[in-house]
Amino acid sequence: MLFRFGSDRWLGVHLGMTGKLSAEPPDHWPGKHDHLILYTRTLALVFQDPRLFGRIRFDCSRQAPKWWSSLPTPVLSREFSIPRLSEILKKRGRTPLKPLLLLQEFFPGIGNWMADEILWQAHLHPRTRAGTLVQPAIAGLHAKIQKISKEAIRIIGRDWSDPPRSWLFLHRWEDGGKCPRCRELLRRQSVGGRTTCWCPACQKAALPRRRSRS
């Protein structure tokens, strides 16, 4: 987020994983995890971040800071279209979907559990290579990226509430957890160096193509 003050003052805020901005009364007293408070006559804008993953930047210039214009396309913007997603998948064709979704230069804001949730809801195996997706699967992946991102902001970003139990989220942490869709035992392994959870029944791995004999 970028805030402008006057003609040449800019404040950039990156929430990170646990950061939160809130509007509080003007007499707000700093809490343990309050790292920036902007006081006005009517309210206090408070930046809280328990795990210190967020960032604050201050710039002085007539134009918006250069780093702002170089940020990747937000996944909830109009520019993040199905053709745009198709380009990314083609460009990183050999990369498995799970580690690809975690690349912030393509999918800013998507973290580990969100990537698992997106793939589970899209019925895609986390090791599926990006370049193997056909158009209906790409459209489905695009829809789930935007749906999960919107719901994460609405549900979790508001007051840290848990998503509904119909999601993978609450079951992916449990030993012996079962898929909320088909009740199959969930599987957890490292994919691309990150702990990954999926349902082997709902997210079947694509069979390797047979080489034609010459």
List PLM regions with ranges.
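Phosphate/anion-contacting hairpin/loop surfaces
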Residues: 11-109, 114-121
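Basic, nucleic-acid-binding surfaces and adjacent catalytic neighborhoods in DNA/RNA-processing proteins
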Residues: 86-214
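A cross-family signal for N-terminal binding/gating loops and helix N-caps
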Residues: 1-56, 175-181, 187, 194-214
